[in-house]
A protein has these predicted regions:
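Shared catalytic-loop signature of beta/alpha-barrel
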Residues: 180, 189-204, 211-308, 312
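Active-site beta-loop-alpha junctions enriched in small/polar residues
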Residues: 19, 104-106, 131-135, 159-163, ...
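N-terminal amphipathic alpha-helix/helix-capping segment at the start of soluble metabolic enzymes
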Residues: 55-58, 81, 85-97, 309-312
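Metal-dependent enolase-superfamily TIM-barrel catalytic cores that perform enediolate-based chemistry
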Residues: 89-201
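Metal- or metallocofactor-binding catalytic centers and their adjacent structured scaffolds
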Residues: 5-82
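Conserved beta-strand positions in the central sheet of alpha/beta enzyme cores
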Residues: 15, 129, 185, 206, ...
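Conserved, mostly hydrophobic/aromatic
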Residues: 2, 9, 38, 71, ...
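Short beta-strand elements
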Residues: 1-6, 301-304
Length: 323
């Protein structure tokens, strides 16, 4: 968690939470070290000047977008409080006040995954991310079981998190293709492999971990390799970079899932503002990470209800951190 204090006594809050050291090229100790490296270059800057902030961060440290994300988030919080506007308005305008959230379905026996979906649907959830990426035949059966208990109002994303070898990904794709309404996400660990799979399947493809910047996004699009992107804000150095990616995706006709690697109330607030400023038709689904945590630093706000997320209306991120 990052707290930025200003001369005008406005404070801004940001957060980053890597999902361990192996999921992406990020980790908690790395975030702390990167922040220590960058902070001296930021001390005298205007936090409402996001361009200057990013120029200073980039001049003091190459890469480490995830650490820069926490500073960027705090600066947007300050910009909103200083201008009296919520971050969604500053990101382009509030286009929706609420949006559908997804639940990740843990990898397990197909019957257990099926029952998990049945239970979550009874709570109002209609967006599901199925964790697969193991034996392709068993994975296809897992997806089939879930499809059996869902309808056209549900969105099913079969997400391998890059877990398959290319051959296994092709086997899984062939078996899943006949199932209705399934989106395929990140079958393999490299962009080249994912593009190969998309070129040999009719399943709509969402790419996540292999899209690390605008360049890889444009490359994947030009290769006709995806129909959607999983937009994790810390991958793109915060809301500033995420807005660029979101707007480019919209221009290219790509849908987006909006979330982050992990986080609490602050990450959830930032995600809610980016989602609220995105056209409803462009959004696949959204994740409120604070639903997955036991601890809360801002009163468990914003909070989901019956599978729906909403965005705060107060200036900045719109949440109050309990200090």
């Amino acid at each position: 968690v990052v707290r930025i204090l200003t001369d005008s006594e406005i404070e801004g809050w940001g957060e980053v939470c890597p999902l361990g050291p192996l999921y992406l090229a990020s980790h908690g100790l790395g975030a702390r070290a990167a922040l220590q490296q960058m902070l001296p270059a930021l001390n005298e800057l205007d936090p409402t000047n996001l361009s200057a902030i990013h120029a200073a961060m980039n001049a003091s440290l190459r890469g480490h977008s995830y650490a820069k994300s926490a500073i960027d988030m705090a600066c947007w919080d300050i910009l909103g409080k200083d201008s009296g506007k919520d971050v969604a308005t500053l990101l382009g305008g509030r286009l929706q006040e609420s949006f559908p959230l997804y639940k990740a379905v843990p990898l397990g026996p197909s019957e257990e995954m099926q029952q998990y979906v049945v239970d979550r649907r009874s709570e109002g959830i209609h967006r599901f991310q199925l964790k697969i990426g193991a034996n392709p035949y068993e994975d296809a059966e897992r997806v089939r079981k879930v499809v059996e208990v869902t309808t056209s109002e549900d969105v099913i994303v079969a997400d391998a998190n890059g877990g398959w070898l290319l051959q296994d990904a092709m086997i899984a794709a062939r078996l899943i293709e006949p199932l209705h309404g399934v989106l395929f996400e990140e079958p393999c660990k490299t962009l080249e492999e994912c593009l190969y799979v998309r070129q040999h399947t009719s399943l709509p493809m969402i790419l996540d971990e292999v899209i690390t910047d605008v360049n890889t996004m444009v490359r994947a699009f030009n290769a006709q390799g995806m129909e959607g992107i999983n937009l994790k804000i810390s991958k793109f150095a915060g809301l500033t970079g995420s807005k660029l990616v979101r707007d480019l995706a919209d221009s290219l006709g790509l849908r987006v899932t909006i979330e982050d690697t992990w986080g609490g109330d602050l990450v959830t607030a930032a995600v809610s503002h980016l989602a609220a400023s995105t056209r409803p038709e462009q959004v696949i689904t959204v994740s409120f990470m604070n639903d997955w945590n036991n601890e809360h630093i801002a009163g468990y706000q914003p909070r989901s209800k019956n599978g729906i997320g909403s965005v705060p209306a107060e200036p900045g991120l719109g949440v109050e951190v309990n200090v």
